[in-house]
From Swiss-Prot:
Membrane topology: Multi-pass membrane protein
Keyword Transmembrane helix: yes
Protein name per UniProt: UPF0391 membrane protein YPO0432/y3747/YP_3749
GO CC aspect terms: plasma membrane
Transmembrane segments: 4-24, 27-47
Subcellular location: Cell membrane
Pfam families in UniProt: DUF1328
Family to which the UniProt record says this protein belongs: Belongs to the UPF0391 family.
NCBIfam families for this protein: PRK13682.1-4 (NF010229), PRK13682.1-5 (NF010230)
Highest rank taxon of the organism: Bacteria
Major localization class: membrane
The entry's keywords: Cell membrane, Membrane, Transmembrane, Transmembrane helix
Length: 53
């Protein structure tokens, strides 16, 4: 999931450098969303863990 966030961030940086402001903003927003979702899922898995009976 973090890999996708980094990919979207790189796409946003390239688009911003080439002057595609709207597309860069969309890619940056997608990178933020993917990153936040990844953090939330990581924290949930960290606290719940794998419980053995």
């Amino acid at each position: 999931m973090f890999r996708w966030g980094i990919i979207f961030l790189i796409i946003a940086l390239i688009e911003a450098a080439l002057g595609f402001g709207g597309l860069a903003g969309t890619a940056a927003w997608a990178a933020k969303v993917v990153f936040v979702v990844g953090i939330i899922l990581f924290l949930i898995s960290l606290f719940t863990g794998r419980k053995r009976l």
